[in-house]
């Protein structure tokens, strides 16, 4: 399964190779240290920065597999990013980021 995710990450990097501003968010089913995430983070910035928090399972979060990524880093200003403590709506905790798109 990891091999498929790595291929998908590489394909996303190709699709978004132009330096237009982009946001990629969701459940990646991959922890930060995985080869999948490392492939993505070679081209994308993690909205959590160094403040990553676990997102799953919602009742007792132990792993982070939900992300908000941006690129290119030079076009985005991170205002805030956090995991929201809302364990009822899903089996994952939601991730929230407030971003500002910088003008060229």
Locations of regions flagged by a protein language model:
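Active-site regions of metal-assisted phosphoester/phosphodiester hydrolases
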Residues: 1-104
